[in-house]
Amino acid sequence: MTAGGYQRLVQSTIGDWLRHGKKTGFISADSGGVHIASSKGNRDENQDRAIFLRVQSTIRERPSIACIALCDGMGGMQSGGASADLAISTFASSLVTGKNGRLAERLELATEAANQAVHQEYKGKGGATLAAVACSSTGEWSAINVGDSRIYTFISANGLRQISTDDTLENMLSDLRLPSPSPEFRKLVRFIGMGDGLDAQSIALGQAQEVIWFVLASDGAYTISEPVFRGIISHSETALDAALKVNDVSAWIGGSDNSTMAILDRRASLFTSWQPSKAGSLQVVGVPGSLQLVIHSEISRPMLSSPRADTRKAPRRKDRDKPGRPTQITDISREVASSNVNDRAPARDISNPSANLVHDNYVEPRLDIEITECEES
């Protein structure tokens, strides 16, 4: 199988998981180091997607990578939710299968891969934003942003600071200093799916060691009012509390847009706390739950067989790889797993502003999939 085919297989697995999973709710992972919360508001569909991933390479010399990412499907275009699914799953698969050494370059290449995938599918009529922060086990930190989703850093001494720039016409024309820009100035000039000319540049995070939280927010979250948004983040006791409060306020004031928060605690032991049983392990966490992938290659070995295995061919595509190099996806276990402590409490739909402010913990399903690439010798 070619490298491109291998990446497409990982992308389709993540994309299917997101597409068929729940879209609204919240999840915490890594002993409180990662929090994702998403609310539909009064919209018919939640077109926001957010995930946390980390991958351990099969090659020992390559560092492990962790990343938190958010995509907001553009509702005024075709298939906003599907565009967000395709954008974030392509970004994730490109990031974890990329071979370039520098983290910043891998983020840029993964962003361009997502852009081209969405453009090819929707021909410029569908799109999404993208905000992501990533780190490696060697201590590298980098971020990237396209569109008007935002990336903030929270440092106790300095409060909340936006480190991304909204890709709007208003910002491009900021030198005009218009007192109250008309709505057309707030339109996006860059988005995932626009095709050629994206030219996304990574954001350097040289002082990452001073950061407490990296905060990713869709526009439905931060537009509740800048002072209110900043006040909630700055005065919340925990990151999850902050995320849920922002989404609740968004719903209380009308819920005119989806609201999604994804927060990464920089102090979390993202790599030492995760000890996968197999090399090549990829973990993806999102509102649907937790997806575990084991990705590795085998040469001249027969297909794995198991009476309980759910084995199927890779999805057919027009540009499918040549025959003779089969790929097996084996569903090796389905079990309930969660970092939340209460495994009996039901999930609460946080899009309902009249519900109790106490957000009950709940358990999400974990799907373990082993992807084995079998090559002829």
Residue ranges of model-derived segments:
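PP2C/PPM-type serine/threonine phosphatase catalytic domain
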Residues: 1-377
